[in-house]
Amino acid sequence: MTIEERHEIEIKYCELKWIINSLQTQLTQMERDKRNLEKAIAGAYFQDIKLALEQSYVKKCQEVDEVRQLKIDYTNKLLKIHDEYLKATED
């Protein structure tokens, strides 16, 4: 492996690491929002408000699942690149 190829893999690795960290930050905030919606639903007095909050909650849960899946996908890519790098440096 040339120095340029190794450098390219290191850049990809760093970019993926940054994406994963950003997704984790986003996921943490979304989980917090989800918990706040749960509390709002529990405290809602009027049925129409409760229904609207429940719809928001369902949407938020879907968004959380999507971001979580993205994080998994990027983590898998990161692991593949890490394995490639390790194999290349062993040669």
What are these regions (language model features)?
Residues 3, 80-91:
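Short acidic DE-rich linear segments
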Residues 25-61:
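Short E/K-rich amphipathic alpha-helical oligomerization segments
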Residues 20-27, 56-84:
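Amphipathic alpha-helical coiled-coil segments
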Residues 2, 6, 34, 44-46, ...:
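Functionally constrained cores in energy, signaling, and assembly domains
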